[in-house]
Amino acid sequence: MFLAKSIVCLALLAVANAQFDTNYASGRSGMVHLFEWKWDDIAAECENFLGPNGYAGVQVSPVNENAVKDSRPWWERYQPISYKLETRSGNEEQFASMVKRCNAVGVRTYVDVVFNHMAADGGTYGTGGSTASPSSKSYPGVPYSSLDFNPTCAISNYNDANEVRNCELVGLRDLNQGNSYVQDKVVEFLDHLIDLGVAGFRVDAAKHMWPADLAVIYGRLKNLNTDHGFASGSKAYIVQEVIDMGGEAISKSEYTGLGAITEFRHSDSIGKVFRGKDQLQYLTNWGTAWGFAASDRSLVFVDNHDNQRGHGAGGADVLTYKVPKQYKMASAFMLAHPFGTPRVMSSFSFTDTDQGPPTTDGHNIASPIFNSDNSCSGGWVCEHRWRQIYNMVAFRNTVGSDEIQNWWDNGSNQISFSRGSRGFVAFNNDNYDLNSSLQTGLPAGTYCDVISGSKSGSSCTGKTVTVGSDGRASIYIGSSEDDGVLAIHVNAKL
């Protein structure tokens, strides 16, 4: 059976190739994961912040009905009851309005979709009013019956690919994606989201599904909806959650022919570097030399909703909002470097790793509160609103596809490079000051450092950098400064 599935996978490869295109609007790059936000709040954020600040896309939490769990943990969203679009984030009408409003301001929507499994035992009723009996594998809201699932068995050996793909992940009832009826229901669900104007999908737990089955599902999806500004013939961008740190039976290379993958090695490696376990000088060959998938197959991130809580991969090396200086440096590097498709995390604060989003009453999600400096309160972290991050999204948009040039390092933890002649960044992760004359590659003039401040008319709210006629500038980053990074670009010239 595995050989037959492999043949099907290869046959559909040409169809899948269209799924590497992010479908971003021209001149934009980078997406943000607004984790557990409500649809109405995301729509407003697209219009008021994401669009004006150059973000290209927003990843949203699962949109379909999920099991209601005691204490309302975040992970209940990953326990489907049906494919009805009804969650704590809102209903179908609100979701459709959000997608339309975001598309109108150039921000594409990417849905976190869960179809590896259905809810585990205890998930008997859902956010949309549906009921289920997970113990008997009955989910009338779809409907699914026991005929649509793999036999009950637990995953205990990640060196056994059959077990990983055919058994149950932490008790979640494992759907059989090789079943034609299951394929029909999944395609129907995804096509409905495409009709509503989404640009792509993050496929949860892709590692736990056979690549050949995924190839069939992806190959059957309709083209994107041209009513939402997509080019005729466009296909949904597919990014698959495949945790591959090496040493297991399943490899990300089995999935990169079908779509992009979540490159967890990027998160692990960038955390080690900016935590000081590896030196910044070694970043000179950042990319596939570090064991990453190809650039157009890699969705890259500093942290995600799983590994910031110690789940997934990376462990204690993962950087989160709780170590803000290093987190901002790592995020700035990710956005300054051309490798991969970057995704910015936008979190809610937590002390308990099961803790759900802020609520008004223990159940209904609370809206973020916005402060005058663009930051959030009310339990929301909103890293995407940190100046050091959103200004680097603008940096990335400004430099476009220009190559890395003028690399410099001090043989330790101070580095700098330009992106052609359009942007320049410098980093200091040493315990002493960076104070050097460096080649920026930029035209002569005075520039606003978009890390310490922002350009405002003809002035700068932060540090300024003067570039000489030879392209060189005196760069200073004190080891005790709040930010260990400096960035200038041609659109920040004063």
Swiss-Prot record:
Changing D121G: In strain: 1420#1, JP-190, JP-169, JP-186, KO123, TN22 and TN256. The keyword Magnesium does not apply. Keywords: Calcium, Carbohydrate metabolism, Chloride, Disulfide bond, Glycosidase, Hydrolase, Metal-binding, Pyrrolidone carboxylic acid, Signal. Residues 1-18 form the signal peptide. One of its GO terms (molecular function) is alpha-amylase activity. Changing D121E: In strain: JP-55. Changing N410S: In strain: Berkeley, JP-5, JP-35, JP-55, JP-65 and KN-12. Changing S156R: In strain: 1420#1, JP-169, JP-186, JP-190, KO123, KN-3, KN-9, KN-10, TN22 and TN256. The active site is at D204 (nucleophile), E241 (proton donor). Its EC number is 3.2.1.1. The modification Pyrrolidone carboxylic acid is found at Q19. The keyword Hydrolase applies. Binds 1 Ca(2+) ion per subunit. Binds 1 Cl(-) ion per subunit. Ca(2+) binds at N116, R165, D174, H208. It holds the Pfam family Alpha-amylase_C. InterPro entries: A-amylase/branching_C, A-amylase_C, Alpha_amylase, Glyco_hydro_13_cat_dom, Glyco_hydro_b, Glycoside_hydrolase_SF. Changing A11S: In strain: Berkeley, JP-5, JP-35, JP-55, JP-75, KN-12 and Oregon-R. Changing D278N: In strain: 1420#1, AO168, J87, JP-60, JP-169, JP-186, JP-190, KO123, KN-3, KN-9, KN-10, TN22 and TN256. Its cofactor is Ca(2+); chloride. Belongs to the glycosyl hydrolase 13 family. Monomer. This is Alpha-amylase B. It comes from Drosophila melanogaster (Fruit fly). The lineage of its organism: Eukaryota, Metazoa, Ecdysozoa, Arthropoda, Hexapoda. The gene is Amy-d.
